[in-house]
Amino acid sequence: MTNGHINPANVPDIALKDGHSIPQVGLGVLRIDDEGVVPVVESALEAGYRHIDGAAGYNNEAGVGRALAASGYNKGAKRETLWVTTKLRDSQQGYDSALKAFDNSLELLQLDYVDMYMIHWPTPFDWRSTDTWKAFVKLRDEGMARTLGVCNFMPADLKRLHEETGAWPAVNQIELHPTWQQREVVAFCKEHGIAVEAYSPMARGADINAGDGTIEKIAAAHEVSPAQVILRWHIENGTIIIPKSVHADRQKENLDLFGFALTADEHAAIDALDGPTRAGHDPLTFTYA
């Protein structure tokens, strides 16, 4: 199910607690090299994406920047239509180091500001998020980073950040998919007005085969792909999603989620797939240096 060029107006915005709004569907660029990411971002922009999710740790910010510049989305009126996220390397957490790292990211991206700057991992075993957040606030106050977020923060991390800074992030980006729904984390975020953003929204494709054909049966009923079913489930949950694809046709498919809706029974069947199936890393122990 694809309609060629997707009207960006079809993709809803999620209102954030800081007054900004983020397109609910974006393109993730993890594990794409610096040269390869250029045509990937260019094709996504052509398909109608208005949200690009990157990170310093992906080692491709320069390529993303070249794609934005080549497409005219790095400045002017077109820039104002685009949401660009990047993330701080864990090794550069801290007040002065975060400010320096941000300047480098901005230069590589060829931008005057980013729409969201995020702490990539909480590293509770080497907690520096409090000082880092103070640097983030300076960047926000200076108009350099419009929204501040975190990734992979568990409730204990969010509580600690709030206790030590008085602030809740606007967004928490976590691993989230049908077989790893993290309901406790999601509930905590909703309680405190934190928008939830899902990376690996399909468990890197593994969830397509979950539940003895559950996803495939729903896809057949709607004449869409299994991937679209999973992404539609996220949309109906109010989750921001950043599926990755290097293929233009798949990028279009991943954006084409608004011509069908799941029934209550179908949605419940996907809810029932929840289980202990993490596709990524444990935030209690992992660092993305």
Model regions and ranges:
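N-terminal binding-site loop/beta-alpha segment at the start of enzyme catalytic domains
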Residues: 1-82, 202-203, 269, 286-289
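Acidic-and-aromatic substrate-binding clefts and catalytic sites of carbohydrate-active enzymes
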Residues: 32-35, 55-63, 91-96, 124-127, ...
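Short, acidic/polar
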Residues: 33-45, 94-109, 156-159, 180-181
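Short, well-ordered amphipathic alpha-helices
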Residues: 62-72, 102-106, 136, 158
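Short acidic capping loops at alpha-helix termini that bridge into adjacent secondary structure
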Residues: 76-82, 112-116, 146-147, 168-171, ...
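A short, structured active-site edge motif that brings together acidic residues
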Residues: 78-92, 115-122, 176
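CE4/NodB-like, metal-dependent polysaccharide N-deacetylase domain
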Residues: 98-119, 138-142, 164
